[in-house]
C-alpha cells in the first residue's frame, strides 16, 4: 500500500494544479500517476484528500475528493521574536523544530548586541513549510522580515507580552508559571476557529495573543529590557539554566505550547 504524500498548496480549494516545485517532486521524484491519492494542506487550517488526474513533465493536476478542516491543537496565537544567531544554521534549526512543536508566528529582532543583522526570509519560509509537511501541521507559521527592537516594541502594544533576559537588577517572574496563570483563567471551551469559518464564539474574546522576546547571545541591553518593561512587557526567566539563543527560543515555544494546549 502506497504512503499518502502531502503537498503544500496555499490555494488548494480553488486550484486544480500543484505549484511547480511540488509538481516536479510529485512527478519526477515520487513518480505519481493519475489515480494516485494525495493529501493537500493549505497552511490555513484545512487538509484536502485529492486524486491525481494529470501527471506530466512539468505539471500535476488533481481533483479534490474530500475537504478535511483540522482542529487547532492549541489556544491563542503563539508568537516568538528572537535576535538571530551569528551562525544561521542555528536559527534554521530552531525554525524547523519550533514548527514541528507548533506555533503561529516568528519575528527576527535587530538588537543592540545582535551578531547578525541580515536574514534570508525566503529560506526560513521554505524550512517552515518543509517542517509543516513533515509534522502534518495544518497551519504554516508566519515568518516576518527583520525589524529593529525599538520599532518592534512600538508596533506590539497588545496581548500577553514577555521579555526573557538574564539581568539580576530587573525583577523577573517565571515564564511558564505566568503562562499557566493565563491558561487557567481561560474558559475551558475557548477555541481558536479555523480561518475557513466565520463563526467567532464570544468565548474567544479572552484569548489575547502571546508574545515572547528572546535576545542575542550577549542578551538584550539593559536599556532594551527597560524599554520593553516600560511598554508593558513582563520581565521573565526561563528557569535556572543559562541557555543559548536558539535553545531559549525553543524552550519558550514549548512552554507556550504546553500551557495553551487544548
What are these regions (language model features)?
Residues 210-227:
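A C-terminal functional module that forms or caps the active site or interfaces directly
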Residues 147-186, 210:
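A mid-sequence, solvent-exposed acidic-amphipathic segment
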Residues 181-209:
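Intrinsic disorder/low-complexity segments
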Residues 67, 111-114, 240-241:
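Short, ordered loop/turn segments at secondary-structure junctions
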Residues 1-70, 122, 184, 197:
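N-terminal positively charged helical leader segments and presequences
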Residues 222-262:
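Structured adenosyl-cofactor binding patch, chiefly the S-adenosyl-L-methionine
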Residues 71-166:
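RNA substrate-binding interface of SAM-dependent RNA methyltransferases
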